[in-house]
Amino acid sequence: MNKIILFTITLLLQGGLCFGQKPVSVSSKAAGEKFEHFWSKSVGAGRANEGLRAGWLEQLEKVQQNCGFEYVRFHGIFHDDMFPIFEKDGKYTYNWQYIDDLFDRMLDLNVRPFVELAFFPTPLAAENSKTQFWWKANITPDESKYDEWYNLVQAFTQHCVDRYGIDEVLTWYFEVWNEPNLYYGFFDGTKSQYFELYKQSVLAVRSVDERLKVGGPSSSNFVADGRYDGEVESRDGDLITFTADNINDLEWKGSWIVDFLEYCEKEELPVDFISTHPYPTDYPFNPNTGKGKDFSRYVNSTKDDMEWLNEVIKNSAYPTAEIHLTEWNTSPNSRDAMHDFLPPAAYIAKVNLDCIGLANSLAFWTFTDIFEEKGGGESIFHGGFGMINYQGLVKPSYHAYRMLHQLGDEKIYHNDYLFVSRKSGDGKIVALAYNYPEDHYNAVPSSIKKIDQHKNGKSRSLDFNLSDLKSGTMFKIEVLDWESGNIYDYWEQMGKPEPPTREQIKVMKNYAENLDTDLVSADENGEVSFQRTLAPWSLVLIEQVN
C-alpha cells in the first residue's frame, strides 16, 4: 500500500487529521514519560574558519542561550585556512593556534565541538587533489600518507586532552570525514579507502585514551537504489529512483551503513556512534540522458529512516552504538528559498516530536547564514541553511528550536498537532501546538514547488483544556505564523532593502524576535482552555509562567 495512504488512514483513525477535532483534555497531574531533548544536542555550521568571526560567535551564543544547543559540528578543522600542519624539508610540524582559538571561544560559550575529522591539509592530500567549494577543501586521499594522517589525528587529540583535560574531551565526539559516499562531492576515493581512513582515525584517537568516542561513516541522504553499493558512486544505479511513479513507494536505506558496520566488526574496530544525514530529499540522475531530478519525500520519511537505522544497529555487532544524525534540514541546498520561510518551522516541530527516542541527536544544518560553501549569499535572504541570517535576523526555524527548547522533560500528552510536557524540576506545564497541513504530507516543503503554494493549506482547530492547576496559574501564549515572526514577508513589505540600513536592521530584529503573545489564567476550578484556529504551518507555544 502507498505509504502516504497508509500514513493518512492511520492518522484519520487516531483523529489526527480531523480538522474539527474533539476537545483534548489533559490533567497537569497526569503520569509523565521522561524524554530527551535530542533536537538540542547538536547543531551544524559551515567550516571551522568561519567560527573565528565575531558575527558567527555572537549567533552561536544566541542559539546556545535560547535553543540550548550543546555541540556544534562543522567542516574543515584540518583545512589549510586553519594551518594545522607545516612541511619543511620533508618533516611535519603541527600548529594548533587557530583551532585553539575557536575551541576556546566555543567552550567559553558553553558549546562543545562535535569534531569532524576533515579535510586533508595539502601536505597530506594526494598530489593534484580534487577540491570542493571555492575555498578548495582537499578531498583526494593518498594512502601512502595515511601514516601521517594517523600522526596528525593522534597529535591533535593529544593536544586537546592536554589543553582541556581528559574529563572534558571524553564528552566530545570524533566523527571521521563528511559524506564520503559522495564520490562527486566530498571524497574522491573508494569505499575501501574511506574504511581504511576510518581505521587509522579511530586507532589514532583511541591511542590517546581508549574511552574517547569515535564514529562514522557520516554518509549522505538515504537512497532507494544501488548507486552506493559499489566501491564508488555509480550514477547508473539512480535509474530506479529516477523513473519511480511515486518515490514514497520505494524502500529507502542508509548509505554505506551496513558495509561500514560489517567492516568494523571484521577489523575489530570500535564504533561508538553511527552518523548519517537523513535529508528528506534525493537528486537522482538518468544515466541515459544525464538529466537530474529534484525529489522531496513525504513528511514521515525522516522517522522511517531513523527506524531503519535503529533496526540495523540493533542487529549489528554494535547494538549500543549511539545514533547521531549530524546534518538535517528540509533540503541540502544552501540556496533553497524555503529555508527563509515559515513552513520549515512546522516541519522541524513535527519531525522532532514524532522521533523522540529514535536518535541521540538530530543536528539542524545550520544555525547561521555565515556559511560559504557556495560563496557569500547574494542577498540578505538567499535560501541559506541558517536559522539566523547574516545580519542576525532570526528566521521561523529559529523560533521552532527555541520553542522546542522550552518544553519540559516529561511527556504527558502527544498527538499529531499537540505536545504537552511537564518540567520535572518545578512541575510547570509547557505545550506546543503546530499545524503541518495534511494536504502537504506527500512532500517536505522546499522551493522545488513555488513558495506561494505553501501559503495554502488546511487550518486546524485547537481545543485544549488543562485541569488540576492552582487557581490563577498563568500561561503565556506565543504565536509564530504568517503575520508574526515571518521575517521574510516583513522584509518584503519594507521593500526588500538591500542592503538594509542599520536602523532598518534594528526594526527587523524587533519584529523577528518578538512574536504575538497573550496571557491566560486558570479559573477558580483550576482549569484553563486554549481555543484557536491554527493557520497552516503555524506554531503556538503555551508556557506556564507562575
Predicted features, each with a name:
Residues 4-14:
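Sec-dependent N-terminal signal peptides
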Residues 18-20:
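Boundary at the C-terminal end of the N-terminal hydrophobic targeting segment
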Residues 22-158, 165-171, 175-176, 181, ...:
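N-terminal substrate-binding region of glycoside hydrolase catalytic domains
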Residues 37-40, 67-72, 108-114, 169-173, ...:
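Loop/turn elements at helix/coil->beta-strand transitions in domains of secreted/extracellular proteins
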Residues 42, 106, 156, 174, ...:
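Conserved, mostly hydrophobic/aromatic
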Residues 191-354, 358, 380:
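Noncatalytic carbohydrate-binding groove/subsite architecture in carbohydrate-active enzymes
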Residues 324-450:
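Aromatic/acidic polysaccharide-binding cleft in carbohydrate-active enzymes
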Residues 434-546:
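C-terminal beta-sandwich/jelly-roll accessory domains of carbohydrate-active enzymes
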